[in-house]
Amino acid sequence: MNKEFDTLQMQAIEAHDGKYLVLAPPGCGKTEILAERIARALDRGVKPEEMLCLTFTNRASRGMLNRVCERLEAKRNELDIFIGNLHRYCSIYLINNEVIPENAYILDDDDQTEIISDLNSTLVHYRTGNINRNAINYISGLATYIDQRRMGHPESVLPSGPGVLDTKSGDFLTRDFSYFYDIAGRYNFDPQLIPSQHQALTCALQYSAYKKSHTALDFADLLVLAYDHMVTHTDHIRYSWIQIDEVQDLNRLQLAIADELTAPGATAMYLGDEQQAIFSFMGAKLSNLDILRKRCHGHVLTLSSNYRAPSYLLDVCNTYAEQVLGVSPEILPRAVRDEPHRPLDLILTESDDPEKEAMRIEGMVDYYLKLDTAGKERMAILVSCNAQADTISEALTAAGKSNFKISGTDMFRSKAYKTLTALYSVIVNDFDMGAWTRLLYGLGCLRTQIATRDKVHAMRSLMLTPSDLLRHKPYIRQVYELYTGGEAVVFDTETTGLNVLEDDIVQIAAFKIRNGKKVAGSDFNIILHTDRELPEMLGDLPNPLIAEYASRPHMDRAEGLRLFLDYTGSLPLIGHNITYDYLMLRNNCARELQEDVTFTTFDTLSLAKLVAPELKKYTLASLVDTFGLQGENAHLADADIEATLSLLDHCMAQAAGVLRAQEQFIANRSTQLIAARLGKIAPLRSNITSYLHLPVSVTGRTIADDLAFTCRTLTEQGLIDEIGPKFDIFLRYVQSEWVQRDSPGTLFDQVSAHIRDLTVSINEGDLVNSDELITDRLFIMTVHKAKGLQFDNVVVLGVNDGTYPYFTADNVLRSPYSTTEMKQRARAQIKEDARKLYVAISRAGKRLCLSYTRVRQYGYLAGMSPFLHSVSHLFHTGRRS
């Protein structure tokens, strides 16, 4: 064991055979506990495929995954355990269970905002261009609610909203989602028939219709569809060992999904901290902890030792937790580090107004950085909103103080970054229409994403991808002309495994086709000798190659490969998922014959995706079944090529009807302009493709190296803007987190393994946790983005009455017109604001400064937050200004 654990930590680590709730305040070693539990479960014989580890954030999942790999001394891509957030899990689940197409367009927040604001232009201010985010969220929530009601989901997992935007007054009306569902039901959900005064409802229905027509899903859809499939398919996968982190941040639907994934009698551990429940605006339900307390009765543990904060800082957190949050002193953590402190380690300072407070920030920064003589301490300035973070960062940068800001303007959401990563997405998957949309839009092929998405959708309906604009002829036309007037070899291989760099080909089967017909007497079928062990199972099925190998004579490997090359000559090769077989062939020939062989290849997998892009699965067996074709996918090469030819015949029959329309579409002037713009990246794309499947050990080019090169090339060509200095930090992150922690493989392997990280899940907060990556010692961010992070010195700005708690909640409580429901929500918001401030003060590891102003923005009276009354005596009081 690499670390000693205290008694309560050991109880949490060794807990099994039951359901457990572990309440873990900040600094109690939660991540180490989670990692150790996984290691010990594996030691006890729990199978990796029976284990599931869910986290709330991608940052948390990466931290846990890294700890587990360090503990097990394993590479990340060797660990067959899902460790990640629920959205990611549901995405994989939906594809594996054929609920959504594998190339479904997953809309991010920016996509969602653009689509909804395009459907309802009143959501964009006509002068400033500012978008009403609250209305966007309401409309998307309403669309989700309607979908769930139509699916018959129970009330307990439905979203709820405060009201709908009144487009005349700009205010929200207190109408429940169910009110609008009832209206929609009267008109059979047709948005064109909804009365004009219900614009939000119309927009929600139009948004749902848009997603359906474009095979698109948003993040909420991933959860809703996964839950619906689970409750209607009781034989779905369940796990006998499951642990879920940050349960206080889950909404009811997410908790219900986790419950569906938990097998009867499973070992289940839930970890959370109600003092850090600050995500109700995302649907999180603090009451989940009450549900879990009852579920885990008798198995509730509260970790009581804080290993991170010195005693004087923990005294502040504990006093606040007891007096403001109402936490029993019996369960508050004790400090392991009983260190003396100087008076200025805890500062409470007052300024006249926000402008004066901002003027003092530079002095605060100088003070804390001068205390750090070793130059290793990190400082955070925490604020309540993104706009304030932007303003402070700009001012400090202008003053020559380098800082790392995390706000709403995340580098990973920039147009330049999305364009860069979209290029890699389409290189590894030509049928990712979402990535093509981002790439074409980012390159300036069309003016808006809406127009770009529609153009890509039109191409999809014509059996085209934008790659066809870079070819001399569209892919499907090339195959059609070869099929109807040429000669080719249909072939397949069976192998000892899936590693194209190392595994052996064992069987090669082929025949020739000419003018769309199989050439009589052209059958080719050999077994090659191998010293490698054949896998006993192919998924859930016994491997038929074992019996075939045992019953037939074996050829010398070099002799057999030479025989096939002589048989093929220079003819093109056709196969299903031919990239795999072709790479196997090339690498086997390189090993056995010391020859670099190349062929023109065509893939029936690609043809099927062009012909039927809406399908959920594209294995040879499923396509034979879906299209009612002859042949079977027997996992023996000689049988599989017969099925492949049957699939080829079907695809060519379908293609014949669109070739003329393809010609007309490509000849259109607007398409030609897109092709010309897209052509600017053709040499770069071709270059990357040339070494995509070569071992990184040969090319010396990792994913980090390639991202740097491609970004530089696109920038120099003026195709994307400068991404900025944070991109260099990201490249160091990629090298340390992905390249060094994974087995090397090829560039294709690295990109494929991390394409979701590249394009969806990463954010600037993921870069903060390593001193090795970021040389900046000063960080600026909102409290929400600071959750889960730790800094030596923390300054919390604007700790005012009116911010903590937010003034609107007080206004609701004072108003004689507020309903009981409105007052309940206001009280809940005040409690959450109190927890938000707790999260802020608990980020500090050495020193803490809380700053407030006597008046807030626009001259409203403020003063110190009432939440601080119970702890103000613990602080040194700073001067006024």
PLM region descriptions:
Residues 2-14, 18-23, 60, 82, ...:
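Conserved helicase NTPase motor core
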Residues 1-102, 238, 315-318, 838, ...:
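P-loop NTPase Walker
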Residues 426-487, 514, 662-855, 859, ...:
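Conserved helicase C-terminal RecA-like lobe
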Residues 2-6, 10-26, 49, 102-105, ...:
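Inter-lobe coupling/hinge region of RecA-like P-loop helicase motors
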Residues 486-489, 496-586, 590-598, 617, ...:
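Conserved non-catalytic scaffold segment of RNase H-like nuclease domains
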Residues 255-346, 522:
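Conserved RecA-like helicase ATPase core segment
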Residues 50-148, 158-159, 290, 600, ...:
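Conserved P-loop NTPase-based nucleic-acid remodeling module centered on helicase motor cores
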Residues 15, 78, 99-196, 300, ...:
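ATP-hydrolysis module of ASCE/P-loop NTPase motor domains
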